[in-house]
């Protein structure tokens, strides 16, 4: 697994790209599932108007962003979907990387059951941040959980491919930060 020191880099854009191709692993409730990280978004507080910690705003929900890098920041979006972020950087520097999509690697059958995805297109199983959490069983219970633990970690194993950058999704309110290419996608060659 990646050491805690990996997550302490203060350059969240670098880490959002560097996480691509690594395998996100969960071993929860006796079931192991994992996926290759293929899409991320960087959130760089305090200046990023799309970031929960814009202008050093602190709420009960976003407090994990102010922790040392290497923990999970999981929150509910629209009161329905859990979203999983990797907290990066040093204490009190509110940076995080949203894991937007994975490519199933281990336990795809378990992911299908968790998502009730039988007889549906496999390429849509984990192609969104809420779907990732459902497939890997990442719930609010694991908010602030160490990402260097047997239960949840990111493997040193890394797949390569072509990386593209695009604007982040769903942040129309973020003014000049709306169109920055802080979303990173990995296209793995077969």
UniProtKB/Swiss-Prot annotation:
It holds the Pfam family Pur_DNA_glyco. GO terms for biological process: base-excision repair. The lineage of its organism: Bacteria, Pseudomonadati, Chlamydiota, Chlamydiia, Chlamydiales. It comes from the Bacteria. Belongs to the DNA glycosylase MPG family. GO terms for molecular function: alkylbase DNA N-glycosylase activity; DNA binding. InterPro entries: Formyl_transferase-like_C_sf, MPG, MPG_sf. It is an enzyme of class 3 (hydrolase). Keywords: DNA damage, DNA repair, Hydrolase. The keyword DNA-binding does not apply. This is Putative 3-methyladenine DNA glycosylase.
